[in-house]
Amino acid sequence: MEVEVKAKQAKAAARRMAVLDENTKNLALNHMADALIKDIGKILEANKKDVVEAEKRNIKASLIDRLKLDEKRVEAMAKGLREISALPDPVGSIEKMWKRPNGLQIGKMRVPIGVIGIIYESRPNVTADAAGLCLKSGNAVILRGGSDAINSNIAISSILAKAAYETGIPEGAIQLIENTDREEVNRMMKLNGLIDLIIPRGGASLIKNVIENSTVPVIETGVGNCHIFVDETAKFNMAKDIIVNAKVQRPGVCNAVETVLVHKSIAKEFLPLMVEELTSLGVEIRGCQITKEICPQVKEATDKDWETEYLDLILAVKVVDGIEEALDHISKYSTGHSESIITENYENAMMFLKSVDSAAVYVNASTRFTDGGEFGFGAEIGISTQKMHARGPMGLEELTTYKYVILGSGQIRK
């Protein structure tokens, strides 16, 4: 079985990864970045095969956008690796140290998790991000991308692994499962003792499948039914610009807005401005009854729209009585990813920040900033929507755990 063989190789590599010095890891990351640029033609050629195949299968445009690479995106992948190399290495750092009355010194040391399995869909840039972050945090990684991006992933992972091994990274530390049979994923999720953690990145069905079937511990990531609430004191131009950015810039990503809630006192003035701007940009609006009365051209929303992560140029719009109804709606339908309030009212802003139970909560800013790079973490492994171990964009520190180190001078317990 391919996955079991590679998991054993990764497990062996993980022991050596844990003790690598920072200079070796940084050298490898920069060499990997150089290799991506050097072999950019090979990557784009492989990616073209994936895109052509996706177009033949009539995959929607927003998903093809996630799959497609160009020189700029490959350069961004290389830049991400260099940025990771410049970040402080968390491995081996002592978070705190205290001394007991018997003279024992006890501390918490950051250590790698071990072998991390990444299961993801049609975004080949994840291959580079995951390999880079796992390497810098001292972990071995097993990558299992979607079949849509198999040619791209093989090209990228082989280039990265070769470059890493040339600079002293143990062989087996970067593995890609090339078999696209879903049964390989099922096997991967049962490899307790070989794989220490699985992180799924993709749509709701993928994440649900991993959570329900994995016996290996899982960090749940990023289904993003994200909301923006336009409060009655909002500046219209600011609100419109934020909503356009959050919906239109990249509609197929998890931090794009899916539902806009508008305070009833400004709905008659604000909604026509917002709807006109969005429809001119190709966005389909699905509105509540009040929204439809104000803007008859919009489609009528159903209850299903409030719970849908469209990942497309579609936006649900609802008029609410005020912040309390907005908070109730978000509490009911949010996936815990990212929510924003547009307001000039300090009390409402603070209420929103305290009340919304999501990984990232904004005041007067686009939800599109929920991203490891934008948060200053470098590339991210994913955006956790759970509360245990990691929450929000997961950078280097979130890919480590800790152990207690105890320094003595002959103490015995009495």
From Swiss-Prot:
Keywords: Amino-acid biosynthesis, Cytoplasm, NADP, Oxidoreductase, Proline biosynthesis. GO terms for biological process: L-proline biosynthetic process. Its main location: cytoplasm. Pathway: Amino-acid biosynthesis; L-proline biosynthesis; L-glutamate 5-semialdehyde from L-glutamate: step 2/2. PROSITE patterns: PROA (PS01223). It is an enzyme of class 1 (oxidoreductase). It holds the Pfam family Aldedh. It catalyses: L-glutamate 5-semialdehyde + phosphate + NADP(+) = L-glutamyl 5-phosphate + NADPH + H(+). GO terms for cellular component: cytoplasm. It comes from the Bacteria. Belongs to the gamma-glutamyl phosphate reductase family. HAMAP family: ProA. Catalyzes the NADPH-dependent reduction of L-glutamate 5-phosphate into L-glutamate 5-semialdehyde and phosphate. The product spontaneously undergoes cyclization to form 1-pyrroline-5-carboxylate. This is Gamma-glutamyl phosphate reductase. The gene is proA.
